[in-house]
Protein backbone atom coordinates (compact mmCIF):
# COMPACT_ATOMS: atom_id res chain seq x y z
CA UNK A 1 0.00 0.00 0.00
CA UNK A 2 1.34 3.41 -0.92
CA UNK A 3 0.45 6.67 0.81
CA UNK A 4 0.01 9.58 -1.56
CA UNK A 5 -0.45 13.13 -0.22
CA UNK A 6 -3.13 15.18 -1.97
CA UNK A 7 -1.73 18.58 -2.92
CA UNK A 8 -5.08 20.39 -2.96
CA UNK A 9 -6.45 20.06 0.55
CA UNK A 10 -3.81 18.11 2.46
CA UNK A 11 -5.75 14.84 2.72
CA UNK A 12 -3.88 11.61 2.38
CA UNK A 13 -4.99 9.00 -0.13
CA UNK A 14 -4.10 5.35 0.17
CA UNK A 15 -3.53 3.39 -2.99
CA UNK A 16 -4.58 -0.22 -2.71
CA UNK A 17 -2.25 -2.47 -4.63
CA UNK A 18 -4.03 -5.12 -6.64
CA UNK A 19 -3.11 -8.64 -5.74
CA UNK A 20 -2.83 -10.66 -8.88
CA UNK A 21 -3.98 -14.23 -8.64
CA UNK A 22 -2.77 -16.95 -10.96
CA UNK A 23 -5.05 -17.81 -13.88
CA UNK A 24 -7.51 -20.66 -13.56
CA UNK A 25 -6.12 -23.91 -14.90
CA UNK A 26 -7.94 -26.55 -16.93
CA UNK A 27 -7.29 -30.23 -17.58
CA UNK A 28 -7.53 -31.41 -21.17
CA UNK A 29 -9.09 -34.88 -21.08
CA UNK A 30 -9.49 -37.51 -23.80
CA UNK A 31 -12.58 -39.73 -23.53
CA UNK A 32 -12.74 -43.36 -24.58
CA UNK A 33 -14.85 -44.64 -27.45
CA UNK A 34 -15.11 -48.02 -29.18
CA UNK A 35 -13.99 -46.84 -32.61
CA UNK A 36 -10.88 -44.62 -32.47
CA UNK A 37 -7.73 -46.73 -32.97
CA UNK A 38 -5.29 -46.77 -30.07
CA UNK A 39 -2.43 -45.77 -32.35
CA UNK A 40 -4.35 -42.66 -33.43
CA UNK A 41 -4.80 -41.66 -29.77
CA UNK A 42 -1.06 -42.10 -29.17
CA UNK A 43 -0.30 -39.92 -32.20
CA UNK A 44 -2.72 -37.21 -30.99
CA UNK A 45 -1.12 -37.13 -27.53
CA UNK A 46 2.36 -36.89 -29.03
CA UNK A 47 1.47 -34.25 -31.60
CA UNK A 48 -0.77 -31.90 -29.61
CA UNK A 49 0.55 -32.39 -26.08
CA UNK A 50 4.27 -32.80 -26.83
CA UNK A 51 4.58 -36.14 -25.02
CA UNK A 52 7.12 -38.82 -25.82
CA UNK A 53 5.86 -42.14 -27.19
CA UNK A 54 6.01 -43.93 -23.83
CA UNK A 55 4.04 -41.22 -22.02
CA UNK A 56 1.55 -40.98 -24.89
CA UNK A 57 1.04 -44.75 -24.73
CA UNK A 58 0.42 -44.53 -20.97
CA UNK A 59 -2.21 -41.82 -21.51
CA UNK A 60 -3.84 -43.91 -24.26
CA UNK A 61 -3.98 -46.97 -21.98
CA UNK A 62 -5.54 -44.90 -19.21
CA UNK A 63 -8.18 -43.67 -21.67
CA UNK A 64 -8.79 -47.24 -22.84
CA UNK A 65 -8.98 -48.83 -19.38
CA UNK A 66 -10.54 -46.07 -17.28
CA UNK A 67 -12.57 -44.24 -19.91
CA UNK A 68 -10.63 -40.99 -19.68
CA UNK A 69 -7.09 -39.70 -19.52
CA UNK A 70 -5.59 -36.31 -18.74
CA UNK A 71 -3.25 -35.05 -21.45
CA UNK A 72 -2.16 -31.87 -19.68
CA UNK A 73 -3.16 -28.87 -17.57
CA UNK A 74 -3.25 -25.43 -19.19
CA UNK A 75 -4.73 -21.96 -18.91
CA UNK A 76 -8.28 -21.65 -20.27
CA UNK A 77 -7.39 -20.28 -23.70
CA UNK A 78 -4.67 -22.84 -24.36
CA UNK A 79 -6.83 -25.73 -23.11
CA UNK A 80 -9.72 -24.59 -25.31
CA UNK A 81 -7.46 -24.36 -28.35
CA UNK A 82 -6.04 -27.84 -27.76
CA UNK A 83 -9.53 -29.33 -27.40
CA UNK A 84 -10.59 -27.72 -30.66
CA UNK A 85 -7.45 -28.88 -32.49
CA UNK A 86 -7.81 -32.48 -31.28
CA UNK A 87 -11.51 -32.73 -32.12
CA UNK A 88 -10.97 -31.16 -35.56
CA UNK A 89 -8.09 -33.53 -36.37
CA UNK A 90 -10.11 -36.55 -35.18
CA UNK A 91 -13.12 -35.58 -37.33
CA UNK A 92 -10.94 -34.97 -40.38
CA UNK A 93 -9.47 -38.45 -39.88
CA UNK A 94 -12.97 -39.94 -39.50
CA UNK A 95 -12.71 -40.77 -35.79
CA UNK A 96 -15.25 -39.95 -33.06
CA UNK A 97 -12.57 -39.20 -30.43
CA UNK A 98 -13.86 -36.78 -27.80
CA UNK A 99 -11.68 -34.25 -26.01
CA UNK A 100 -12.94 -31.97 -23.24
CA UNK A 101 -11.58 -29.49 -20.73
CA UNK A 102 -12.37 -29.46 -17.02
CA UNK A 103 -11.39 -27.05 -14.31
CA UNK A 104 -8.30 -28.39 -12.55
Curated annotation (Swiss-Prot):
Classification via Gene3D superfamilies: 3.30.1390.10
Cystine bridges: none
Pfam families per record: ClpS
Transmembrane segments: none
Domain of life from the UniProt record: Bacteria
GO biological process, one term: protein catabolic process
SUPFAM superfamilies: ClpS-like
The protein's assembly and partners: Binds to the N-terminal domain of the chaperone ClpA.
Its job: Involved in the modulation of the specificity of the ClpAP-mediated ATP-dependent protein degradation.
Similarity remark: Belongs to the ClpS family.
HAMAP family the UniProt entry points to: ClpS
Protein name: ATP-dependent Clp protease adapter protein ClpS
Organism encoding this protein: Paraburkholderia xenovorans (strain LB400)
